[in-house]
Amino acid sequence: MKTKFIFVTGGVVSSIGKGLAAASLGALLEARGLRVTHQKLDPYINVDPGTMSPFQHGEVFVTDDGAETDLDLGHYERYTSARLSKKSNFTTGQVYFSVIEKERRGDYLGGTVQVIPHITDEIKSKILDNAKGSDIAIIEIGGTVGDIESLPFLEAIRQFKADRGAGNVLYLHVTLVPFIKTADELKTKPTQHSVKELREIGIQPDILLCRCEQDLPREMKAKIALFCNVEEKAVITSMDAEHIYAVPLALHKEGLDEQVVEKLNIWAKAPDLTPWQQVVDKLMHPGHGKVRIAIVGKYVNLTESYKSLAEALTHGGIANDCRVHLSYLDSEKIEQEGIDGLLDGVDGILVPGGFGERGTEGKIKAIEYARTRKIPFFGICLGMQMAVVEYARNVCHLDDAFSSEFKQDCANPIIHLMEEQKGVSRKGGTMRLGAYPCTLAKGSFAQKAYGTLDISERHRHRYEFNNDYRDLLVSNGLILSGIYKEGDLVEIVEIPDHPWFVGCQFHPEFKSKPLNPHPLFRAFIAAALHNIKA
């Protein structure tokens, strides 16, 4: 089958839900037996989000091949069976970088390099390259229609219909139909203006996905269809759902996937959405009550920084048929106020990854609290490193143990800079990134969770466990249960005489899905649930 292209744009406001809409559509089309791939086009000039502040950009999602990408790729992977790559996310910065490199090589034979055709051709080339081998390529354009940064991307996708043929390209526009409380009615004017702006660029949307608080009445759909030049049945209501994993079911009920296959002339079987219905049923009606998990971090004022983490914990709840209630605790608050009372009543404690010294002592106090009070604990990346520091200080009595990331001259650098990172001065794209294999210790918490001895997980770090302290820590009871054998790197640590205490250097949250929860999150939530019963 010749690849079909679906371009997802957004209007009126940012954060309107394009990513979830694209991911949900991917889930619906995959349920129809189609091979789906996703791609996100970001208009900012940064080469990638790897060096951007979590407070500005939210989470950085890492792919198997080591790309630091937009958090929407996390949605795409969670909702489908896809394993995305560096090709699945590109930015204005990457496009211009590539075009300038070609110009310096002489690829343009002395021609004047312009936005049209050179920049737009580069954008189209990257879209086509990513789409190879798929039936459907869903491409989300970041930003909002009308943003000056988005114009080259919109021009490129406008050209796509002429390049590939009308029956092979579909434009889906996500827009807002606000409810005005004082007037007690929904207003279509923002949608009309958004579509008008899109049409001025030369793009006529085929489907409108209308985000609204209330169901759109038939007469309002007819009005939108008339003024926006789309079929009435192509005006799709997208109301706020009880849970984001209910969105595919809601959009299917509205007929979104039916409209897509009809307009793209695709023969596809009816979707089997039973697995999604089961997920939603477990979320809405859990059989084993609720567990309370505290996330102790430094970016808690912007929970988007921990997007995949929060979702993976929810997946652990799905696997254990229980509801997971998350509370976010700023580790600096622990430093300022002490830990007394801040973690009362929690059933599990998780310390996530992060960068910089701020808040680290608060994390160490939270880890000590979990260790000494036998509360299930999960440390990820920096969380694992601080767990080792806490153990060295309070069990091995190395009072000055720390990470050389935060104190270069510390006497006992339990965590130190990786050998291959020494001499690296550039920040962007230079960490240990992507998937690496790991061998597990038989009988460990990790091995029991995975059910195998050999695993592969995604990394994003520069610092690691210092092997000079292996013997000391092991002789004092710490288990090194996961090793990257090629580099002899410690990837997982555990405390065996504890209900469940695991720290891992990698980011397991990036591989968890609602239909296939990650083994470590499944085991962590199971331990928290058992902690309640105990």
From Swiss-Prot:
GO biological process, one term: 'de novo' CTP biosynthetic process
Residue span(s) of domain Glutamine amidotransferase type-1: 292-534
Protein name per the record: CTP synthase
UniProt: ATP binding residues: 15-20, 72
Activity regulation (UniProt): Allosterically activated by GTP, when glutamine is the substrate; GTP has no effect on the reaction when ammonia is the substrate. The allosteric effector GTP functions by stabilizing the protein conformation that binds the tetrahedral intermediate(s) formed during glutamine hydrolysis. Inhibited by the product CTP, via allosteric rather than competitive inhibition.
One GO location term (cellular component): cytosol
Chain sites annotated for binding Mg(2+): 72, 140
Positions that bind UTP: 14, 187-192, 223
Subunit text: Homotetramer.
Catalytic residues in the record: 381 (nucleophile), 507, 509
Catalytic reaction annotation: UTP + L-glutamine + ATP + H2O = CTP + L-glutamate + ADP + phosphate + 2 H(+); L-glutamine + H2O = L-glutamate + NH4(+); UTP + NH4(+) + ATP = CTP + ADP + phosphate + 2 H(+)
Native organism: Geotalea uraniireducens (strain Rf4) (Geobacter uraniireducens)
GO molecular function, one term: identical protein binding
Recorded family membership: Belongs to the CTP synthase family.
Note: CTPSs have evolved a hybrid strategy for distinguishing between UTP and CTP. The overlapping regions of the product feedback inhibitory and substrate sites recognize a common feature in both compounds, the triphosphate moiety. To differentiate isosteric substrate and product pyrimidine rings, an additional pocket far from the expected kinase/ligase catalytic site, specifically recognizes the cytosine and ribose portions of the product inhibitor.
Source organism, top-level taxon: Bacteria
Residues holding CTP: 14, 147-149, 187-192, 223
